[in-house]
A protein has these predicted regions:
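A short, proline-enriched helix->beta-strand linker immediately N-terminal to the Walker B motif
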Residues: 173-177
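Short coil-to-helix segment of the ABC ATPase nucleotide-binding domain corresponding to the Q-loop/switch region
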Residues: 112-121
Length: 234
């Protein structure tokens, strides 16, 4: 993989199967799974901002799931942040995901813990041990997402936009080279969505590639970037 290339897909076909990382051979999964996308070639480099657009069911989310190994890559060549997706084992998946950031539309925050603990617990779970380093990194990401004065707040005390900023902060804790965002502005009003896009652009400018699925063409017009259209399984 080139030094600054974080995604490389060549001749990739993506299937949805009931047990994508089970014990069945790829040939059986291909035969019994549902073909979602075919003949995908894609390269993304550090610091690049890329939109994935298309109708619901066009395969945007399936591509993202393949990149963070929720779906197994069965056909074609694929590398993400140095990991070969065709050779990936179940035990490798946590290590892959520590090198990428993932932002979901539905937040998935720990509702019984405040902003600080939502981040602190993730860092402990991913191997951080030194207390001073943990607190320093939490301060850094909270400043980046403009939540430095909200660390004591509970998730229910935050607005929708602030909750999404917390999710982004969580995704950035391990300094990823790639951020994957699945419809991150889908539940937000236009002004708040603009703020999230500005934040993503700032993150990309710092060298982290951002790949974002969306159906909001107004955002793309206001914040133009490389755009990939998904239609008819491609």
């Amino acid at each position: 993989m080139n030094d600054n290339r974080v995604i490389r897909l060549k001749g990739v076909s993506i299937y949805h199967a009931d047990d994508p990382f089970g014990s069945y051979p790829p040939e059986r999964l291909v035969r019994e799974g549902e073909l979602i996308l075919s003949d995908i070639d894609l390269e993304v480099h550090e610091g690049e901002f890329v939109y994935l657009i298309g109708r619901v069911g066009s395969g945007k989310s399936s591509l993202l799931k393949t990149l963070y190994a929720e779906l197994q890559l069965l056909q074609g060549e694929g590398e993400v942040v140095g990991f070969d997706l065709r050779c990936l084992k179940r035990k490798d998946i946590p290590y892959l995901r520590r090198r990428i950031g993932i932002v979901f539309q539905d937040y998935q925050l720990l509702t019984d813990r405040n902003v600080f603990l939502n981040l602190y617990d993730v860092m402990r779970a991913t191997g951080w041990k030194e207390e001073a380093a943990i607190r320093k990194r939490i301060d850094e990401v909270l400043q980046l997402v403009q939540l430095e004065n909200k660390s004591y707040k509970m998730p229910f005390e935050l607005s929708g936009g602030e909750q999404q900023r917390l999710v982004i902060a969580r995704a950035l804790l391990n300094s990823p080279k790639l951020l994957l965002a699945d419809e991150p502005t889908g539940n937000l009003d236009p002004v708040t969505a603009d703020g999230i896009l500005e934040l993503f652009r700032e993150i990309a400018a710092l060298g982290c590639a951002v790949v974002m699925s969306t159906h909001n063409t107004a955002l793309i017009e206001e914040y133009p970037a490389r755009t990939l259209l998904f239609a008819r399984g491609r």
